[in-house]
């Protein structure tokens, strides 16, 4: 902001959440144009400066092929597919809730689960015990999905369970129904507000983290 003022360069900012952080609230006073991802964020800035622009999506996670994606993820059945993702680092509460109903889920669905790299070993071990006499071939766990893996994940998933970060816009770009579980202690409570604004459009169901238990999911 200071550099733009000194050099007399027009300032453009982008707000990716439904509620702006302190920096963008401050910068908004000096910005010439302000792009927002959620309509709710517009009320925090001068109306004449604001444009609803969404969030840019990486092209490399779009445009998959379902047959190739199923092969890459080792999915060979014809059941509906639930995709579970907690961001690049995973989400412990979502992992625990998924494992809590994993036996029941895999009786009716294939489950593709990004656990987070740090959680992968523990989740995989617990899933192995849970599914010892179940449908272990229907559970597909990954510590981390790169861009091609994410493309396959979104391509095959019939329902997505996720946090409510910028991944909302990836889910929206694919047109997938979702269950969003906002991170409870996110800054400015932005994930919860993101989730409810998205839900107001009829695009998802929101489960708040304190209400999350295995059997709420199934």
What residue ranges belong to the model's regions?
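Short alpha-helical segment that forms part of, or immediately flanks, the ligand-binding pocket
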Residues: 2, 151, 168-176, 196
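Well-formed, non-transmembrane alpha-helical positions, independent of function
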Residues: 26, 43-44, 152-153, 170, ...
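Short Ser/Thr-rich beta->loop micro-motif in glycosyltransferases that lines
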Residues: 163-166, 182-186
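Active-site-proximal region of nucleotide-activated glycan assembly enzymes
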Residues: 5-67, 75
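Acidic donor-binding loop of glycosyltransferase active sites
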Residues: 155-169, 176-177
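Structural loop-to-beta junction motif characteristic of Rossmann-like glycosyltransferase folds
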Residues: 9-11, 158-159, 175-183, 203
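Donor-nucleotide binding loops and adjacent catalytic segments primarily
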Residues: 68, 75-159, 192-196, 200, ...
């Amino acid at each position: 902001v200071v550099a733009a003022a000194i050099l007399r360069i027009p300032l453009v900012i982008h707000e990716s959440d439904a509620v702006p952080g302190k920096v963008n609230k401050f910068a908004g006073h000096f910005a010439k144009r302000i792009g927002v991802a959620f309509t709710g964020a517009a009320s925090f800035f001068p109306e004449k400066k604001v444009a609803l622009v969404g969030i840019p999506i990486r092209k490399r996670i779009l445009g998959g092929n379902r047959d190739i994606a199923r092969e890459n993820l080792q999915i060979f059945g014809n059941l509906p597919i639930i995709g579970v993702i907690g961001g690049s680092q995973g989400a412990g509460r979502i992992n625990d809730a998924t494992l809590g109903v994993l036996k029941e889920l895999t009786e009716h669905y294939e489950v593709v689960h990004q656990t987070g790299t740090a959680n992968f070993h523990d989740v995989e071990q617990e899933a192995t015990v849970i599914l010892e006499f179940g449908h272990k071939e229907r559970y597909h766990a990954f510590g981390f999905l790169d861009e091609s893996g994410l493309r396959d994940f979104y391509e095959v998933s019939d329902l997505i369970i996720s946090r409510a970060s910028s991944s909302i816009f990836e889910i929206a770009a694919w047109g997938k129904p979702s269950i969003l579980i906002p991170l409870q202690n996110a800054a400015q409570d932005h994930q919860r507000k993101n989730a409810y604004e998205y839900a107001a459009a009829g695009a998802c169901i929101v489960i708040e983290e304190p209400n999350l238990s295995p059997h709420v999911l199934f």
